[in-house]
Amino acid sequence: MNNKPTIGIILGDPSGIGPELVSKLLTDKITDKANCILIGERSILEDGEKTSGVKTNLIPAKNFEEVDFSKGSKFFIDITNGKNRTYEKKIANAESGASVLESLDYALDLAKEKKIHAINFGPMNKTSLILGGCKYNDEHDFMQEKLGIKEFCCEFNVVDNFWTARVTSHIPIKDVAQNITAENILKPIKLIHKTLLMSGMKNPRVAVQALNPHGEFGTEEKDEIIPAIEEAKKMGINAGGPLPCDTSFITAFKNKEYDCIIGMYHDALQCGLKAFGFDRGVTVSGGLSVPVTTPAHGTAFDITEKNIANMEPTINSFQIALNMSERLANSTS
């Protein structure tokens, strides 16, 4: 067997653009840098190949025990054992959600058994996941529970190797301030620092946003945010701020003064990040025992089967999985 990391790949929601993007990914030279195992259904793969006009030529395997990387570096495990399922296109539905959950569950089992070093998946649809039986808010919560992770986890968004994380996420604005505590702020600071080191960045510079306009007109900066930054510095983390939200992306991202930024609430980060590069973005599930990456965009039902979806986020998401898994593979070999 070669020394390349092993990455489990999932096609994403079969009703959206995931299968066509992943089919193209598997024919891109970037995937030659890893051992790849596509986990899914043959009918979905064939749909993706047909739309994208490529042939992946993956080596079939009934299960992981049949995977032999001395024979090649790209395998396909059909979790249906040859069943020919069909899925309605361009709409959220239970069948598609259940298919994604089945593939993801299989990949997570391989990760728990340390048979793969990372997971990279095509875009999923949260509505389909819930219709398909997911009992959690999204795939991130599902993965955390499946892997038995009790520690803090959060979602990272990445554009041009600039990373973001949030103290609060999908909660009402009226509830944000009460959740801004030094303890809660320190958690994503520590996690993003650790994750960036794992991705190969040395001494990452961590910016922390303010909560209030211009970092004034409130006490959260003085009472909670600054103490969290100071505590991070004591831990050896190169943290700075608080930066006013309205100019934070100019300072940190455009002027390249920081490598990542921590925001206090969802839109304080997402508006800036998406304005600067949503078409290139990647989502990383932070805090899990295995790197998990995906394009930041959704299933794009409106352009499904048109073969016009931008490949860049898919390539970028695989590259991050590759960077992180190389270090994980080396540490366990």
Q: PLM features: residue spans?
A:
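Contiguous, glycine/small-aliphatic-enriched amphipathic segments in soluble metabolic enzymes
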Residues: 1-139, 182-264, 268-281, 288-293, ...
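Ligand-binding beta-strand-loop-alpha-helix segment within the catalytic cores
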Residues: 68, 157-179, 183-186
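Short, well-ordered, mixed-charge alpha-helical segments that flank or form enzyme active sites
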Residues: 127-131, 151-154, 163-165, 173-175, ...
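Glycine/threonine-rich beta-strand-loop-alpha-helix active-site module
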Residues: 131-154
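Short, flexible loop segments at boundaries between secondary-structure elements
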Residues: 146-162, 286-302
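Beta-strand scaffold of nucleotide-dependent catalytic cores
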Residues: 154-156, 167, 272-274
